[in-house]
Amino acid sequence: MQRDCTMDYKESCPSVSIPSSDEHREKKKRFTVYKVLVSVGRSEWFVFRRYAEFDKLYNSLKKQFPAMALKIPAKRIFGDNFDPDFIKQRRAGLNEFIQNLVRYPELYNHPDVRAFLQMDSPRHQSDPSEDEDERSTPKPHSTSRNINLGPTGNPHAKPSDFDFLKVIGKGSFGKVLLAKRKLDGKFYAVKVLQKKIVLNRKEQKHIMAERNVLLKNVKHPFLVGLHYSFQTTEKLYFVLDFVNGGELFFHLQRERSFPEPRARFYAAEIASALGYLHSIKIVYRDLKPENILLDSMGHVVLTDFGLCKEGIAISDTTTTFCGTPEYLAPEVIRKQPYDRTVDWWCLGAVLYEMLYGLPPFYCRDVAEMYDNILHKPLNLRPGVSLTAWSILEELLEKNRQNRLGAKEDFLEIQNHPFFESLSWTDLVQKKIPPPFNPNVAGPDDIRNFDAVFTEETVPYSVCVSSDYSIVNASVLEADDAFVGFSYAPPSEDLFL
């Protein structure tokens, strides 16, 4: 059976996972909802499903595809359905089920699967392979996919320089792995991307934009840094800081919400990182708890720069529809021009979630959530300070021109009374002790990563270099398309 995700099917092969589950109550009934992350190209969204919905899909598909031998965890007749170990085991089984669905075009293009994953929803149909403001610019005629993407760096690094130990994350183009460099025993997070998938989705520009942003991050303490990058004939490799305190999302799911001092500390470090990006004319555009990591001491580290927009000065705007539904600003939903203040809206949404446990306008129905973001007044419940209420109201202002940060950007956030007790100088110098210590056991501790990832087998293909003599023409063309991807820092810094 064919497993090619790039042939003449409706769209790119989706990537799916179940990062978490949550308990809900409705009309005095208690049930577990599983949060399914779906990625197709540069679009990404969440779908919330109960076990009964997985079971219904399974029963429909097993009759139509008996040879597939699909399976899901069995219904539990006796025992506690809300036992944490049972829910964890069931989530792993359901994750395996949906992973199998997206391996086969016959399955992931089936109407029941597409409906289950909401793949045909109009809100997921935008094609961000090009920015909207760039589509209107006429492009010179070209008959080749080969492009020069920057200066060539150090070509000597190779996959065999590393021992690849664990899968610690997944995306639509590849995986992130914990790797140990053989030369000095240092641990890194290595992001491995498939060139063929990147090319088929016309994403070279976004990959190189991410690389460019990463190169600038070494100057800021709360942004993940790129040590170097290299490529084989089939894959691209980013060698990044390994940050093992866990996603903010991971800790927030476990603790539901944070005390205000802890939320303030994280918000300040996030704001500092965003302020730095803005100072070098970069808008982040995709702030969410899943993209905010904690290091081994408990400091914030912002990661994943694939949706960053470069070259945006304080008065500039852009129009691309991108981001994650729960955190989209009103002007993005309306497809109106937006500016740096989109990041301050997202900061408000993340701060609100840290304090209250859910994003500010959250609803399981995404269309209704969009309507809430556009029209519903902000609901500020008791339990937080007046200055917290104030900054949430000002960051989550629906009119971007009146939003906190609209006039003087990061300076306005720094000067807000909510942060009055903080020394921003001490913060950037990491002199303020974090309010929470992840208590990692060492540089290779992965306890704060989801077992859905870490229990996966490390693919052998990421560990080897391809031989040019045996690759086909399309792979060689892919290699030409990424001229300039490889990067090495100055030699004195290479093995620090």
From Swiss-Prot:
<dbReference type="InterPro" id="IPR008271">
    <property type="entry name" value="Ser/Thr_kinase_AS"/>
</dbReference>
<dbReference type="GO" id="GO:0005524">
    <property type="term" value="F:ATP binding"/>
</dbReference>
<dbReference type="InterPro" id="IPR011009">
    <property type="entry name" value="Kinase-like_dom_sf"/>
</dbReference>
<dbReference type="GO" id="GO:0035091">
    <property type="term" value="F:phosphatidylinositol binding"/>
</dbReference>
<keyword id="KW-0808">Transferase</keyword>
<comment type="similarity">
    <text>Belongs to the protein kinase superfamily. AGC Ser/Thr protein kinase family.</text>
</comment>
<comment type="function">
    <text>Serine/threonine-protein kinase which is involved in the regulation of a wide variety of ion channels, membrane transporters, cell growth, proliferation, survival and migration.</text>
</comment>
<dbReference type="GO" id="GO:2001240">
    <property type="term" value="P:negative regulation of extrinsic apoptotic signaling pathway in absence of ligand"/>
</dbReference>
<keyword id="KW-0968">Cytoplasmic vesicle</keyword>
<feature type="domain" description="Protein kinase">
    <location>
        <begin position="162"/>
        <end position="464"/>
    </location>
</feature>
<dbReference type="InterPro" id="IPR037709">
    <property type="entry name" value="SGK3_dom"/>
</dbReference>
<keyword id="KW-0067">ATP-binding</keyword>
<dbReference type="GO" id="GO:0031410">
    <property type="term" value="C:cytoplasmic vesicle"/>
</dbReference>
<keyword id="KW-0723">Serine/threonine-protein kinase</keyword>
<dbReference type="InterPro" id="IPR001683">
    <property type="entry name" value="PX_dom"/>
</dbReference>
<dbReference type="Pfam" id="PF00069">
    <property type="entry name" value="Pkinase"/>
</dbReference>
<dbReference type="InterPro" id="IPR017892">
    <property type="entry name" value="Pkinase_C"/>
</dbReference>
<dbReference type="Pfam" id="PF00787">
    <property type="entry name" value="PX"/>
</dbReference>
<feature type="region of interest" description="Disordered">
    <location>
        <begin position="121"/>
        <end position="157"/>
    </location>
</feature>
<dbReference type="GO" id="GO:0106310">
    <property type="term" value="F:protein serine kinase activity"/>
</dbReference>
<dbReference type="InterPro" id="IPR037900">
    <property type="entry name" value="CISK_PX"/>
</dbReference>
<keyword id="KW-0597">Phosphoprotein</keyword>
<dbReference type="GO" id="GO:0005769">
    <property type="term" value="C:early endosome"/>
</dbReference>
<feature type="domain" description="PX">
    <location>
        <begin position="12"/>
        <end position="124"/>
    </location>
</feature>
<dbReference type="InterPro" id="IPR036871">
    <property type="entry name" value="PX_dom_sf"/>
</dbReference>
<feature type="short sequence motif" description="Nuclear localization signal">
    <location>
        <begin position="195"/>
        <end position="205"/>
    </location>
</feature>
<feature type="modified residue" description="Phosphoserine">
    <location>
        <position position="129"/>
    </location>
</feature>
<feature type="active site" description="Proton acceptor">
    <location>
        <position position="286"/>
    </location>
</feature>
<keyword id="KW-0418">Kinase</keyword>
<protein>
    <recommendedName>
        <fullName>Serine/threonine-protein kinase Sgk3</fullName>
        <ecNumber>2.7.11.1</ecNumber>
    </recommendedName>
</protein>
<keyword id="KW-0967">Endosome</keyword>
<feature type="compositionally biased region" description="Polar residues">
    <location>
        <begin position="139"/>
        <end position="151"/>
    </location>
</feature>
<feature type="domain" description="AGC-kinase C-terminal">
    <location>
        <begin position="420"/>
        <end position="496"/>
    </location>
</feature>
<feature type="binding site">
    <location>
        <position position="191"/>
    </location>
    <ligand>
        <name>ATP</name>
    </ligand>
</feature>
<feature type="modified residue" description="Phosphothreonine; by PDPK1">
    <location>
        <position position="320"/>
    </location>
</feature>
<dbReference type="GO" id="GO:0004674">
    <property type="term" value="F:protein serine/threonine kinase activity"/>
</dbReference>
<dbReference type="GO" id="GO:0035556">
    <property type="term" value="P:intracellular signal transduction"/>
</dbReference>
<feature type="binding site">
    <location>
        <begin position="168"/>
        <end position="176"/>
    </location>
    <ligand>
        <name>ATP</name>
    </ligand>
</feature>
<comment type="subunit">
    <text>Interacts with GSK3B and FLII. Interacts with PDPK1 in a phosphorylation-dependent manner.</text>
</comment>
<keyword id="KW-0547">Nucleotide-binding</keyword>
<dbReference type="Pfam" id="PF00433">
    <property type="entry name" value="Pkinase_C"/>
</dbReference>
<dbReference type="GO" id="GO:0015459">
    <property type="term" value="F:potassium channel regulator activity"/>
</dbReference>
